């Protein structure tokens, strides 16, 4: 229902309880389209809070907490895979009665979004990728170093030591403290499963199967992925748009959230009403 902001819960087909937020401040009398917006690894959908005032005025925005993140339960030994994360998106859409929907993701959330669009082209109206190469396998991430560092020091200390790499030009100490505390809520053992799983992913050979309009927003100074690693989208997805954020490191969706949301909104409005 328009003019609302709520946190809700559903049960996936494997029994895991999934949490999701719905924000909708679009005109109640107008046609309604839904955007499913997927957060990055660590933290939860709360990391995308600054996007909501911009996007929810025009779209119903659904933000799931991925498995093991935020208010969603930690998955059991056999309940975490990329296939399962993709299935969660489709089951959430089914739960909400959505035949088709817009889809966007940040970093690891983009990996889930891309897989969903590849496997379910008939369901996805548009796809937006923020700061993700086609999987983490071709990226520059040393996942073993990350996991070992987090296990040895804990999430909070690990993030505090690497915060300058993520946000070299951010001066708001309150934001930096909030980011660390929010991201550090992630279960260490969960990330030790989630991170290496994502590091095995490379969608390059499947990108041609993305049939919907696609937006790629890429950080121009990303230590986790080179420009060449991002350019593969141009080679394999001809119906794509590209925006480079010159000089910015990986965490663009946190450091310049309003800019991200505004660029996404421009893209979505161009395709609104074409379902």
Where are these regions (language model features)?
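Conserved alpha/beta-hydrolase catalytic His-Asp/Glu region
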Residues: 137-141, 153-209
């Amino acid at each position: 229902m328009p003019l609302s902001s709520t946190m809700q819960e559903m049960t996936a087909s494997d029994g895991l309880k999934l949490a999701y937020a719905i924000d909708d401040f679009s005109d109640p009398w107008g046609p309604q389209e839904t955007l499913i917006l997927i957060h990055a690894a660590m933290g939860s959908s709360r990391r995308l809070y600054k996007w909501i005032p911009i996007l929810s005025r025009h779209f119903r925005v659904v933000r799931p907490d991925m498995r093991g993140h935020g208010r969603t339960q930690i998955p059991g030994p056999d309940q975490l895979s990329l296939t399962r994360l993709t299935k969660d998106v489709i089951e959430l859409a089914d739960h909400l009665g959505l035949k088709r929907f817009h889809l966007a993701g940040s970093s690891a959330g983009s990996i889930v979004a891309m897989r969903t669009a590849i496997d379910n082209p008939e369901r996805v109206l548009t796809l937006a990728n923020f700061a993700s190469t086609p999987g983490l396998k071709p990226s520059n991430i040393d996942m073993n170093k990350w996991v070992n560092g987090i296990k040895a020091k804990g999430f909070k200390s690990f993030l505090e030591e690497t915060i300058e790499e993520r946000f070299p030009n951010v001066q708001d100490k309150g934001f930096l403290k909030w980011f660390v505390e929010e991201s550090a809520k992630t279960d260490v053992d969960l990330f030790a499963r989630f991170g290496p799983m994502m590091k095995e992913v490379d969608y390059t050979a499947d990108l041609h199967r993305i049939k919907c309009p696609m937006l790629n927003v890429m950080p121009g100074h990303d230590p986790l992925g080179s420009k060449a690693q991002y350019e593969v989208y141009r080679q394999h997805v001809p119906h794509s748009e590209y925006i480079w954020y010159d000089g910015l490191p990986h965490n663009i969706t946190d450091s310049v959230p309003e800019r991200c949301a505004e660029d996404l909104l421009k893209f979505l409005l161009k395709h609104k009403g074409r379902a």
